[in-house]
């Protein structure tokens, strides 16, 4: 599809974020399995639920524009997921607390991709005829910000302190 209109860019970016969220969902499930801190495990479980809600929302929006949700593959998130594997899942840690600190780091990197994506999509949708899309996407953006803030709270609370002990 030629990206010659804002609508075409909007659909392209919806599909890109749909792909990104699907990839980050699988990575977040694996991070949850690797985590040891109970607050972190809870936050990652909540993250899985939130990402799934985002995927569901994106799918509905994309289909409402007569487009295929799987129309794009997000190479940016593919790279971030590779980083999750390299720095957490396939890495050797002598300390669970240090692993938990790295889990937060990698999760927040994926989350920040989502923040950028949802933020752009909200801006694209704030035009005539897309108010419903904008509201749904704003909810996803707000939820993503909430998850990011929770990870920062956990990191600056017990996890980073335990990792430095």
Question: What do the PLM-derived regions correspond to, one by one?
Answer:
Residues 1-165:
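Amphipathic alpha-helical hairpins
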């Amino acid at each position: 599809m030629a990206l010659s209109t804002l609508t075409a860019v909007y659909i392209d970016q919806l599909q890109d974020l749909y792909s990104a969220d699907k990839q980050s969902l699988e990575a977040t499930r694996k991070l949850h399995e690797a985590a040891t801190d109970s607050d972190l495990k809870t936050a990652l479980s909540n993250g899985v639920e939130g990402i799934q809600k985002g995927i569901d929302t994106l799918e509905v929006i994309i289909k409402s524009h007569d487009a295929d949700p799987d129309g794009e593959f997000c190479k940016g998130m593919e790279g971030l997921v590779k980083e999750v594997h390299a720095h957490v899942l396939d890495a050797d840690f002598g300390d669970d607390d240090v692993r938990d600190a790295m889990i937060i780091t990698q999760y927040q990197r994926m989350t920040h991709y989502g923040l950028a994506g949802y933020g752009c999509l909200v801006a694209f949708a704030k035009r005539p005829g897309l108010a419903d899309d904008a509201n749904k996407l704003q909810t996803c953006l707000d939820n993503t910000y909430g998850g990011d803030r929770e990870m920062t709270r956990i990191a600056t609370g017990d996890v980073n302190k335990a990792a430095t002990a």
